[in-house]
């Protein structure tokens, strides 16, 4: 909706918590539709917007890893050819254009390496592939009561002519006004907005 209202061709969702920064090729679509959303044009847009965001955050030479769509990056075509026919050539073109991009990296190892600091960001192919690792680290629940104890993480929309960040959780209207809301995600969202704004100002000076 924000892309439509601001007149841009497309936007990208980036989730962030600590050094876990994950942008997405697709988000709210059925799994059966994900392969159709993975096109060279869309993947390159996600790579470019992610790289731009990292530069604005003060990372001089961003390193971005691209997650594989299929198990074991397709296992040489045994489990699908999208990683071979779409992702690999797009990554190669980005590298030829001077970007530091690697992949496709199998989805079962890419986020371990991201958390360890081997990459500055990762590109996930679909919603749950990117959301699960970020929320696994940013969300904590009380095992006895099932209540959320910590909700950390930021949802950032890339590609807009404005800076847009938000908390990485729902509206929680059920606890509004009770004095028990967790503020961590909101503070992170404000911090990211400030840092992105500073990056924009620096690029224009």
Task: Outline where the language-model segments fall.
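Anion-binding alpha/beta catalytic cores of soluble intermediary-metabolism enzymes, centered on
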Residues: 1-82, 89-205
């Amino acid at each position: 909706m924000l892309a439509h209202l601001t007149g841009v061709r497309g936007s990208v969702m980036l989730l962030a918590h600590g050094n876990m920064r994950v942008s997405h090729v697709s988000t709210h679509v059925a799994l059966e539709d994900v392969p159709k959303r993975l096109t060279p044009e869309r993947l390159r847009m996600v790579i470019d917007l992610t790289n731009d965001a990292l530069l604005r955050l003060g990372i001089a030479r961003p390193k971005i890893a691209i997650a594989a769509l299929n198990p074991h990056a397709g296992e040489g075509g045994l489990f699908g050819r999208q990683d071979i026919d779409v992702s690999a050539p797009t990554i190669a073109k980005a590298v030829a254009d001077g970007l530091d991009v690697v992949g496709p990296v199998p989805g079962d190892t890419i986020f371990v390496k991201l958390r360890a600091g081997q990459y500055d960001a990762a590109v996930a192919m679909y919603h749950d592939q990117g959301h699960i690792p970020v929320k696994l680290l940013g969300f904590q629940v009380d095992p006895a009561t099932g209540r959320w104890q910590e909700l950390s993480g930021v949802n950032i929309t890339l590609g807009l002519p404005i800076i847009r960040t938000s908390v990485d959780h729902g509206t929680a209207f059920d606890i509004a006004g009770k004095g028990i809301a967790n503020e961590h995600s909101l503070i992170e969202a404000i911090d990211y907005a400030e840092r992105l704004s500073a990056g924009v100002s620096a690029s224009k000076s």
